[in-house]
Amino acid sequence: MKKKKKANPLIVILALAIVMVLITVGVVLILGYRFTTLPNGAKFLGKSENGQPVSGTIKYQTGMEAELDYFAKTIRYKNGDIYIGDIVNGCREGNGVMQYSATGDVYEGQFRNDELSGTGVFKYAQGDVYRGTLLNSKKDGYGVFEYSNGNRYEGTFRDDVRSGQGKFVWASGASYEGGFENDLKNGYGVMTFESGSKYEGTFKNDMRDGDNCVYTWANRERYNGSFRNNLMDTRKVDENGEFIKGENGEYVHGDMAVYTFSTGRTYRGYFVEGQAVGVRIENNTEEVSNP
């Protein structure tokens, strides 16, 4: 009679381990736990019902982690941030409130694809408030930004900065209405100073720069002509903004400017760096701090 071969202990242990893993996986699946990839690319490990993640841990591609509670409408982030609002497939979607623990800022409004997108109100801890549209968590489209120091901007934003047409009003009473690009005054605009003086013309990167501009002082004196680098200047410039010189080494001027005094008397001639060539005129243009 042949003796039965004894089973290899290692094989037995391996088989038992596989069985235990299968049982564990089966129980986990029965209880509704899943490991899935969310629409925003994050990984979710937790309980799901009818394909909807309802409770568990979210691991974002940035390394951030958060705890999801679908029924409580909350996502609590590891860094202390809290989202309260509509949740779809583990992502912020619909209306909600986002509280930022590090800064104390609060956003209340619309969300799409787990980003601040749509219309909403963003309140900064230092007192600034933005009301308007956002896209992918950046100010984009029409909005109103009220600064804690009393300044106010109303107009369009692109990629989180003032770009397009808008109006900026300083707490001092000065105002600018016109074009913006990359948060700076660019293109045609009208700048009204607290004193009542006014500039109408072109801006380049926050500076008065262009032809056919008009600067009117509160005392009714007026300058009609070109500006370069914030100053009255009739010299021509090339495509790089450099002043052009003629063959004789002298600067080349464009059209003559007209300076009208409050008495009605006028001076017609050329200007360089704010001064009339050969004539002394005392009026100075004004400045305000950048928005």
Predicted features and spans:
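Glycine/tyrosine- and acidic-biased, solvent-exposed loop/turn segments at the edges of beta-strands
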Residues: 2-291
